[in-house]
A protein has these predicted regions:
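Short alpha-helical patches at protein termini and domain edges
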Residues: 1-509
């Protein structure tokens, strides 16, 4: 039975929550902020302090506690810096332009321990030539320490590609690698541009979703027919939402809800509505009810695109470093596409051709090949294949990453022990965990008899394949670079971004 005290406590809580919400409403703060773990900690600490808490002043928020948070973030940053010299570092870079056409370039450092935000540069007044991009990247490498950096990952734009070549010419022991997520997204873009069936079908899919989502009544009807499922793929379980993968994810969701959509447009509700009389409504109905043209084309598009979406999700995952997997996963994606089209060559050969053009010219890199060779997940499989490209990639990595010729010879000799599963490599636990442990952890456990090879392998297999971590959390920059904050001194602005971005990265671990 509810007591009087419980009734009063509920009312007190409602009053407190109402005041918290009023603060959020009057400052136009996103409702989603209540899901931030820091929000829960704040509420708990206020409750623990009890009556009489004096709120922080404007000066304390702007000066005192910001400085403390910068120091706290720097301490966290130092923990990551220790990891830089132990394993492999990837410098990740990406650019962003806000609504006012201000350009920001940011730089992150990734290791197996996690990713940290290092710096951002306002490039609005800088011509982004290959030379300038090279100079910015070179300065960042100097800050991190060339001896700690294995690769620099950026997007595939021509100026970044040329800057990467300049970088590898100056810094003889590291690699420039194009972002795998960006490469795969460009493959999907090529599908849409070069394959008429894809272009037309995607456009029709967009028309359907735009039409329904811009009409509240239709959206309400659709919810009844699809029983609470989502029409647009935007849930965390879905693959990465890149610019061009979104189009195929939308087609996938339309396909999942094909029956519900057809039922809705065949229903009495639709037939008796005002929408059916308008030209747009008639046009959308024609598309949805086209079971011989539109829907088979949707299925065909997905047969070609979804295997690549799987690779996209893998390389963008924070779960494990993807370097040891992308080489084989791209081959598996092509095999899956072939299987989806029942091995009929004329049905998939143009898709394969588009993939190969990007893969061979942009994504196929020495690090990818070396990591494939060194990955125990694949190396001992009956399907493992070592062609000339894989061997060239492996030995190119050895030449660049291991400057001492004597050490390279040692590693080359130790590779034979790995290939033949001799010593620790062949014990039962090593065999049983080849596909269960991450490649880096496996080498850490069983590579002690080959110390030089072990260090080399862990550095390669612990690498990320993408700079997509850079593309997240641009909202941190959006929030700082606004009218309301334009009186902040540049250093405070930098401090605020440094704290916000690294806290957001920490949340994701």
């Amino acid at each position: 039975q509810t007591t009087i005290n419980q009734i009063f406590k509920k009312q007190e809580r409602d009053d407190v929550c109402q005041q918290i919400c009023r603060f959020l409403y009057t400052n136009a703060i996103s409702f989603n902020c209540v899901n931030n773990p820091e929000f829960a900690k704040m509420v708990a600490m206020i409750g623990k302090y009890g009556v009489g808490l004096k709120q922080p002043s404007y000066h304390e928020v702007r000066e005192t506690f910001l400085k403390k948070e910068v120091l706290r973030t720097m301490e966290m940053f130092e923990e990551y810096k220790v990891e830089w010299s132990k394993s492999s570092c990837t410098i990740m870079s990406d650019g962003w332009t806000d609504k006012k056409r201000r350009s920001i370039c940011k730089f992150l450092v990734n290791t197996p321990k996690g990713t940290v935000f290092l710096a951002s540069i306002d490039t609005s007044d800088i011509s982004k030539t290959a030379q300038k991009v090279f100079e910015m990247l070179d300065d960042i490498i100097e800050r991190v320490g060339e001896e700690n950096v294995v690769q620099v990952v950026t997007n595939n734009a021509a100026n970044y590609k040329l800057a990467g070549e300049y970088l590898m010419e100056k810094r003889k022991h590291l690699f420039w690698t194009p972002c795998a997520v960006h490469c795969i997204d460009l493959i999907l873009e090529d599908f849409e541009k070069k394959l008429d069936a894809h272009r037309v079908t995607i456009e029709k899919g967009r028309r359907i979703t735009t039409y329904i989502f811009s009409r509240t009544l239709l959206l309400t009807w659709l919810k009844d027919f699809i029983k609470g499922k989502e029409l647009i793929c935007n849930t965390p379980e879905r693959p990465t939402m890149t610019r061009f993968s979104t189009a195929y994810l939308t087609l996938g969701c339309l396909n999942e809800n094909k029956g519900a959509l057809i039922s809705m447009f065949a229903s009495d509700k639709w037939k008796s509505s005002r929408f059916v009389k308008a030209d747009k409504g008639k046009s959308i109905e024609t598309i949805v009810m086209d079971t011989r043209g539109f829907w088979p084309n949707v299925s065909s598009c997905l047969k070609g695109a979804l295997p690549l979406s799987k690779v996209l999700r893998m390389v963008d995952s924070d779960h494990k470093p993807a370097m040891g997997f992308i080489y084989e996963e791209m081959d598996l994606a092509k095999a899956k596409i072939q299987e989806n089209f029942n091995n009929v060559k004329k049905s998939y050969e143009r898709i394969w051709s588009i993939i190969d053009q990007r893969w061979e010219s942009q994504l196929h890199r020495p690090l990818h090949a070396a990591a494939y060779f060194l990955n125990p997940h694949y190396h001992y499989s009956t399907n493992f294949k070592v062609n000339v490209d894989v061997k060239i990639g492996l030995y190119k990595c050895l030449e660049r990453m291991i400057p001492d010729a004597t050490e390279r010879v040692k590693i080359d000799m130790q590779i034979d022990l790995f290939k033949n599963a001799k010593g620790l490599f062949g014990i039962e636990s090593a065999v049983l965990t080849r596909k269960k442990k991450s490649p880096g952890d496996w080498w850490d456990s069983y590579g002690d008899e080959c110390p030089e090879l072990k260090r080399f392998d862990i550095r390669v297999l612990s690498l990320t394949c993408s700079s997509s971590g850079c593309e997240r959390n641009w909202s941190a920059f959006e929030m700082v670079h606004t009218k309301r904050r334009n009186r902040l001194h540049q250093q405070k602005m930098n401090d605020l971004v440094f704290v916000m971005y690294n806290l957001k990265l920490k949340e994701r671990e």
